[in-house]
């Protein structure tokens, strides 16, 4: 993304939920890296007011052409500072290797962001030199390297899926040689512009298969349309998972969502929308809950900054979106889980003896029976109140957590200090 720019009512208990259709379970606990972020001012030392586990370096002044400003001219200050600051915060780093510098562009009219010629296909020689320079300098500090941003859009990539697969293969060999523990992440593809997605994504997977899958991660961007909701995003994820299965992507390759927000205008004449209050908190928390249900390894929220005209949900201190993000982190981080999709989605966290439970409706509404051990419920705005086991609770798009007072106290102790929501 360029910076300019719930059904029928049911009554369900925990036991029933865990034997329903479409369960999702994990062998290990949810890692903090699930919670990704974009931080445009990272090089200046900005520290977000939420817990997060990974950062994607894009739209932060460190793109290829801003670092390598000529064939033999490098300006490393911004990238060095961004990596140092991310390391000091203890978060995993993803670096996006594209886009083509103006000086290396064969056609300077192809792409304008973040500079002229950015969508042009670079020469293999220039690409090798660049990737080698980055990996040799920062190998061991960067956790994953993403090949390109939104390569299904001609604003960012004017080449073919085959050419992108070639760049992917070339970069992967260099990364495996000099930074073998790092992950290689495919070029990302947006989903909401379906014509561009269908033109690029299946073909790119086909070409990656031909060169023996030189990636560890398949990446997409799951922004829904300007008037879209988390339900629409969930449909996109199902579509991507189906295509990955059809393309016979090995099960060892994770799916990451490397950009997400809501309310961004388009495609076409679809207007954007500003999303605040309870809706912002609910949708943000739903995003990360849906990830564990759908098998998405990470989502990088776009982005931590002041309110602007581009994005529907503001991610900033005190805003509901940030509180929803932080609350989801508090509930999920380091938890084992078992989830069930339905009209009311149910995720059991922790052990089966005294579980914590999170429930929400992706579409419509329903009811849920408070589990036997639960005495407290909290919503995604982190508002908590007492409940009685066996009571029937109305469930909508606002995720609700159920557990004991002791479990809630432990959760609350993980929160960072931040301003009380007011916007």
Give the role of each language-model region.
Residues 385-423:
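C-terminal beta-strand-rich structural cap/linker in extracellular carbohydrate-active enzymes
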Residues 223-270, 292-293, 297-301:
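Glycoside hydrolase catalytic-domain groove-lining segments
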Residues 1-26:
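Secretory targeting and sorting signals
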Residues 27-61:
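Boundary/entry segment of secreted carbohydrate-active catalytic domains
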Residues 341-373, 380-382:
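Carbohydrate-binding surface patches
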Residues 34-41, 116-122, 270-277:
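Active-site mouth loops of central-metabolism enzymes
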Residues 50-215, 219-225:
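Substrate-binding cleft and catalytic face of glycoside hydrolase catalytic domains
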Residues 261-330, 339-345:
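Aromatic/acidic polysaccharide-binding cleft in carbohydrate-active enzymes
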């Amino acid at each position: 993304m360029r910076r300019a720019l719930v059904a029928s009512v049911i009554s369900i208990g925990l036991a029933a939920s865990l034997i329903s259709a479409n369960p999702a379970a994990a062998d290990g606990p949810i890692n903090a890296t699930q919670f990704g972020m974009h931080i445009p001012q990272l090089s200046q030392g900005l520290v977000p007011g939420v817990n997060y586990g990974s950062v994607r370096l894009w739209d932060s002044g460190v793109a290829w052409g801003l670092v390598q400003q000529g064939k033999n001219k490098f300006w490393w200050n911004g990238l060095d500072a961004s990596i140092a600051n991310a390391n000091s915060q203890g978060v995993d780093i993803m670096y996006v290797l594209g886009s083509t510098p103006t000086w290396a562009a064969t056609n300077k009219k192809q792409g304008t962001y973040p500079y002229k010629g950015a969508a042009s296909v670079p020469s293999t020689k220039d690409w090798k030199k660049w990737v080698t320079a980055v990996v040799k300098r920062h190998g061991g500090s960067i956790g994953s390297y993403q090949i390109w941003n939104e390569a299904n859009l001609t604003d960012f990539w004017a080449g073919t899926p085959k050419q992108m697969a070639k760049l992917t293969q070339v970069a992967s060999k260099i990364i495996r040689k000099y930074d073998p523990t790092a992950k290689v992440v495919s070029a990302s593809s947006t989903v909401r512009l379906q014509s561009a997605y269908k033109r690029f994504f299946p073909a790119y997977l086909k070409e990656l298969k031909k060169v023996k899958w030189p990636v560890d991660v398949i990446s997409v961007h799951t922004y829904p349309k300007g008037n879209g909701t988390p339900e629409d995003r969930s449909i996109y994820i199902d579509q991507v998972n189906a295509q990955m299965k059809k393309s016979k992507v090995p099960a060892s390759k994770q799916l990451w969502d490397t950009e997400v927000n809501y309310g961004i205008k388009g495609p076409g004449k679809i207007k954007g929308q500003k999303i605040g209050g309870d809706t912002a908190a609910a949708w943000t928390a739903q995003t990360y809950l849906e990830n564990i249900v759908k098998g998405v390894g990470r989502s990088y929220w776009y982005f931590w900054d002041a309110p602007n005209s581009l994005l529907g949900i503001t991610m900033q201190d005190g805003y509901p979106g940030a509180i929803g993000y932080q609350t989801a982190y508090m509930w999920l981080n380091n938890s084992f889980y078992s989830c069930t999709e339905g009209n009311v989605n149910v995720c059991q966290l922790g052990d089966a003896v005294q579980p914590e439970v999170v429930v929400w409706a992706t579409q419509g509404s329903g009811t849920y029976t408070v589990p036997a051990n639960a005495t407290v419920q909290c919503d995604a705005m982190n508002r908590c109140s007492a409940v009685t086991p066996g009571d029937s609770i109305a469930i909508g798009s606002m995720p609700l957590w159920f557990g004991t007072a002791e479990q809630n106290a432990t959760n609350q102790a993980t929160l960072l200090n931040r301003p009380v929501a007011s916007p």
